[in-house]
Curated annotation (Swiss-Prot):
Lineage: Eukaryota, Metazoa, Chordata, Craniata, Vertebrata
Coiled coil: 51-115
Keywords: Cell cycle, Cell division, Coiled coil, Cytoplasm, Cytoskeleton, Microtubule, Mitosis
Pfam families cross-referenced by the UniProt entry: HAUS2
Record's subunit section: Component of the HAUS augmin-like complex. The complex interacts with the gamma-tubulin ring complex and this interaction is required for spindle assembly. Interacts with EML3 (phosphorylated at 'Thr-881').
Location relative to the cell: Cytoplasm, Cytoskeleton, Microtubule organizing center, Centrosome; Cytoplasm, Cytoskeleton, Spindle
UniProt name for this protein: HAUS augmin-like complex subunit 2
Amino acid sequence: MAAANPWDPASAPNGAGLVLGHFIASGMVNQEMLNMSKKTVSCFVNFTRLQQITNIQAEIYQKNLEIELLKLEKDTADVVHPFFLAQKCHTLQSMNNHLEAVLKEKRSLRQRLLKPMCQENLPIEAVYHRYMVHLLELAVTFIERLETHLETIRNIPHLAANLKKMNQALAKMDILVTETEELAENILKWRKQQNEVSSCIPKILAEESYLYKHDIIMPPLPFTSKVHVQTINAK
């Protein structure tokens, strides 16, 4: 550290200078560290960096726009390419020529359209006869099934209502099936009872004839095999 000038009042040693001199003498701080601490950063450096960042962002935005324009030009290159434009022009010219020919033959075409086609026979090559036979079979089948298909198409709007009616009919059918099963069970039970009664009738008749012969009075109990007998002598 340079010695202070005793005649310069600004160079007179102060407390901070003495402390720094002590640190330098002890080796805790060197001159390079002091020189680095003396460097000051301008307050306009951040503004300069901000301006640079803004310029870079603007340049990036401009490049992105150029890239989008290039992509759009690439996508539309096939449309505006002279080769494809020439093909389209040729196609349009052909259609125009065809329409001109149709307009020129308008009268003959109208006469041909008014004339019934049943009076003309279209020639078909022999190699296509079998295909025509198959085609006619398909046409006949289609005509036969046309009415069914049309009826199906007409019923499409009423499909929900028809399904609802079908579900109701199925529910009623289930109820009828259940009632029929119960009725069949009752009929079987009744038949079984009738068979039992039929088998008991001869026994009852035999008992009545026996009681009648021996003057025995039987109380009127319907269809029972147990007879409570009361004789005249027991009274």
